[in-house]
Amino acid sequence: MAEEHFDVLTKSGEKTGVSKPRGEVHRDGDYHRAVHVWIFVETTQQLLLQLRSDDKDSWPGQWDISSAGHISAGDTSLLSAQRELEEELGVKLPKDAFEKIFVFLQECVTNDGKFINNEFNDVYLVTILHPIPLEAFTLQKEEVSAVKYVPYEEYRNFLSKEDPAYVPYDVNGEYGKLFDIIRQRCQVNTEARSLSLQKQLQRYSPVTLEAKLTELSEADQKALGLIVKAAKIMDDIFYEQVWNSNPALRDWLKDHANASKLDKLKWDYFTINKSPWSSLDENEAFLSTADSAVKLLPGATKAIAGWKGLEYRAAFPVTKPPGANFYPPDMDKMEFTLWLNGLTEEQKHAATGFFSVIKRRSEANLDASDHLASSTKKLPDSNSDLYSIPYSEIYRPFLKKASEFLQKAGDLVSSPSLKKLLHSKAEAFLSNEYYESDIAWMDLDSKLDITIGPYETYEDEIFGYKATFETFIGIRDDKATADLKLFGDNLKLLEDNLPLESVYKSTDVSAAPIRVIQLIYNSGDVKGPQTVAYNLPNDEKIVKDRGTSMVMLKNVQEAKFEHILKPIAEITISKEQRGLVDFDSFFTHTICHECCHGIGPHTITLPGGQTSTVRKELQEVHSAMEEAKADIVGLWALKFLITKGLLSKSMVESMYVSFLAGCFRSIRFGLTEAHGKGQALQFNYLYEKGAFVFHEDSTFSVDFAKIEGAVESLSHEILTIQGKGDKNAATLLLNKYCTITGPLKTALENLERVKVPVDISPTFPLAEALMN
């Protein structure tokens, strides 16, 4: 039998591209990777230990980790963890049982210098409810002599005293994290945790959003009920897109919401964030795997009479995965890039496109999702472990049902353009071709306004490629829509006059239609802070061919102005300028923000002559840069339109002061969120230029003599970076300015002290009633 080979790593853990036999790796002291799997019993607070065989090369006859093993060359971490547990103990678990809690570097020499172990260990925790009966294990005798359960604190004491019966681990060093994590979950102060969740919830002001349906026919109202049902399915898909165990966590929290006050708070805050990670706390986890769903797995071990089987907690990582559920969690950029280089142009387009998920062949049988398993039966031939699956396949059970609802709704509605949108979107869900349905969305001219499908890419923090599903349903405000025609009509004029070298300007900008709606329902990727407007589609081909359209959510903006911006201005804006903060300026800048998503560089030419897009070149920093661009260029655009006599001069001062107040609103979303990050960049840049002034009473004002030049300067810098596709320059700019500076910290602390809400949490009773 050939000797097992390992991937040789650098001292920092990256693959070198070299693999060597196991014996040579330990002889030469090469860095390599392994997995540690700990089984923790929740009810007894015990860890499962294995007794290493007397024939082992290292630490023979000593008690050790539940299961451990090397990652063979070409294998993945998760697959290795699952395989080692099954081979050594006879325990077979799906991937959602494994929680990767940290990576531990072990550097030691044993056997008189003959065995050098330089090993990066991916440490996994498997949480089970009750002990597995000892007779249910199937031990691999050449590796494991016995197993036993030990209380975790008792085991920690053995290790700290360097008891010779146990394989040594430095519990006062990095490996102490294991025991810290378990202790935090076991020693919960229910009252303190409830108070913490209450404070987090209080940052959202509850609002009810409705609109009059009197102008909709009876058939349109019936269709609306079907559309809301389709929108509910967008929620189901989005939960899946966030993380593989997220749907199970949602169902578990909902089912147990009435068990206690704490359980109700968990559910309430989860429904706002749609995940265990808090949007307003830079995605810090407010739940742990200990709060997650319990799953019964009767076939995980040998069957034992009288024992129903293994029950485990569906795991999720403490740190929000940057690739969400779009990529394998252990995939890095280098692996993706190497795979991409071996694909045809058509395959590359699919892999980097909006509407596909990247998976591993080696983990196909580990996926806990039934619908995914059916999608992996016909894997395309390739030497790579990675492959892509279109949304229309991986989410087919969801999309098939949503498609049926939209098809029926389209049959009912009276508006020809809405009928076309609903029918084309129903087809797109099943074909994965969204171009025609997005054109139909841009051409929509209906009292009932619908946006549904995969659009935004904020959740993909690795590349910014993959789109999440969302829905916005509203009733068009015809008067407000007519009032805003000015902005769409002047989009080309704005593009031609951007503070940007002509070589980077777009030559084919068309007027962007603007629709103003009263929102009556949203779903999918609408977690945390609520959007007040959106500019779609994001597909560069459509932007190039047709431009974009924007939708303004007027009742959402009014709610935010009343509940958030006015109270913020009272605290942060100087007394002399406070009265300049008004809704019209806030609303008008939001319009310009969305308009400016449609101008500036999108499809670009690189120095080597290749055609690309800003999104693909800037990758994970694109979202923050694009939001900053839309904000600051939007402010520039307002002043430009005023100078041209197209807007009233009376709003010059109010638009700048309202923008300043709005900075504090957005930065409170956190610096991991694209809008908050983009706003911090703008605030700190303008403050550095003297355009914003900080006073002794901890309030701010605008220096009207400096603000116009500073806005134009920042607009030029961001637009130029986008025009060049210069990711390095974008990263440097964000790193310099996306910080909480002293004055900014003071303002945020003052807002926290008086408990001004950070955002709103809407409910939609009208839409819910229609659906039911």
UniProtKB/Swiss-Prot annotation:
The biased composition feature labelled Basic and acidic residues covers 1-14
Which class of enzymes does this protein belong to? Answer: hydrolase
**SUPFAM superfamilies found in the cross-reference section:** Nudix
EC number(s) stated in the UniProt entry for this protein: 3.6.1.-
What is the taxonomic lineage of the source species? Eukaryota, Viridiplantae, Streptophyta, Embryophyta, Tracheophyta
Domain spans labelled Nudix hydrolase:
30-172
Q: Which organism is it from?
A: Arabidopsis thaliana
Return the InterPro entries for the record.
Answer: NUDIX_hydrolase-like_dom_sf, NUDIX_hydrolase_dom, Peptidase_M49
Name recorded for this polypeptide: Nudix hydrolase 3
